[in-house]
Structures are given as C-alpha cells and as structure tokens.
Amino acid sequence: MPSRSPSPSGSSADSSDPSADSSASRDAVVVALRAAGCVFAEDEADLILATARTPAERDAMVARRVEGLPLELVVGWAEFHGVRVTVEPGVFVPRRRTEFLVDQALAHAPHASVVVDLCCGSGAVGAALAASLGPVELHAADIDPVAVRCARRNLAAHGGHAHQGDLFDALPAGLRGRVGILAANVPYVPTGEVPLLPAEARDHEPLTALDGGGDGLDVLRRVAAGAPDWLAPGGILLVETGERQAPAAVEVFARAGLTPRLAVDDELFAHVVTGFAVR
C-alpha cells in the first residue's frame, strides 16, 4: 500500500453546511482507502468515521490504514461472534472463521462450567464462549505479554483470568482434570509459507501467532499431548487448523488418546478438530 494518500480533511465542500462537510469527508476517506487498495473502502470509511472522535483522529486512522495496518487495529476493536473485542497493535486479530470453533464448542458442550482459551491472543474465543454459556470459570493463556494484557481487558466483564506462559505451564494447577472446554486457536501456518501471507498479517501480527513450525502442526501436537491431563470426564479439546493439515491433526488427536472429529464449514473455509476425552 502507498505510504501517503489524500488527506480526508481536504475538500472544497461548503463549510456552512454540516451535512455537506460530512459527505465530503466520507468521500475523501473512501478515495484514500480505495487508492490504497482497500476492497471494501466504503464500509471501512463508515467504520473509521463512526469510531473517530475528532477530525485529527480520523485523519490519523486513515493514515494508519493506508500504511497497511489491519482495520481492526486501526479502530481498536473487532466484532467476533457477537462480542466486541478490544485489539491493539502487536495482537493477533480474531478471524471470522474462528467463530466456527466457538459454534462447535457450544454444540458439543453447552453446559460446560470451566473454559480454557489456550493461545488466546486477544481472548476473543474465551469471551465469546463466556457470553454464550453464561457464568463459567474462565481462564486464558498466551506466551505473548501484549496478548495477555489485551485478553485481560476482554475477559474482565466475564470474571475471566488471563495468564502468561507457555501453553499448559501458564495455567493454575487446580484446573487439571476439570476443564469442560479447552479451545486452542494454535498457529498453523507452515514456517516456509509465512512469507507468503498477506502483508496485513505478515507485517503487523506476532509471528508466534502465525508460525506453526515445519508442517504447521508443532503447537497442535503439544496441545493434544497435554490436553488429556486437563480435561474433565467428557470434556473436549477444539483446535482450528488448515485444510491440508486437518487429516494429520485428526491422527495426532487419536494418538493422544482423544476421540477425534473433524468439522468443516465451507463458507468460512474453517476446519476444526474436536477431541473428546475418553476417561
């Protein structure tokens, strides 16, 4: 994307007509975003204009978007499964396809009372599950301190706790054998394919949230191996993965002693492997 664009404040509208000023400002924002390659320039312009509190803030938001910052990071929030989630630079932006993971969790464990969001990023999955399930004991964990800080804000309304550390090492020991839903949006992009990702992800999101190792399954293997010790009887592990990795992910779950099931949403291009505790 180009580093400069027409300023949204520059227009020849009659300043005595507020509606004309507003229309001219929107048009200028749309032009700037479209020139930068934003496919949904009109929708993005409306979101920026609704979020910005001052013309200066609006111009700064447009400039950041033109420079390639993801829209969600520009406005500071993302809509996820009906929940507005706070996001900030350096944090993985929740994807719409991951809503399918939440749907699968709710379908298979609608009465879960203990929920863990592993590799939580902003805590979007945990917040969405808590919003749908009602009062639950909610924990989230991530290795990235920036993500944990963001997750704490998003989980506060649900009484949730976010912990910093490496996977299960971050969780309170008292959760062992008690978790009804263990959701893990693990990184699953093979290392060699990270440079091929869109610039918005490659340049503005943490590598730890994207890079899944040589075949994209390094973190998934560790999560599957550790999950049985943490799941309650009848508890479930849910992990999002890519289409190519899905068959191997199912095998990993089975080798870990879980009963696996692959669910696919073709519209969202989402693949979720669910592992059911057998004990």
Show where each model-derived region lies.
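Conserved AdoMet
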Residues: 2, 42-108
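Intrinsically disordered, low-complexity terminal tails and inter-domain linkers enriched
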Residues: 3-24, 169
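Residue-level signal for inorganic ion chemistry
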Residues: 48, 68, 98, 125, ...
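Conserved SAM/SAH cofactor-binding pocket of Class I
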Residues: 100-196, 244
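Class I S-adenosylmethionine-dependent transferase superfamily signal
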Residues: 105, 129, 201, 223-227
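Conserved SAM-binding loop
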Residues: 140, 212, 238
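Mobile active-site "lid"/loop adjacent to the S-adenosyl-L-methionine
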Residues: 188-219
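Conserved Class I SAM-dependent methyltransferase catalytic core
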Residues: 215-276
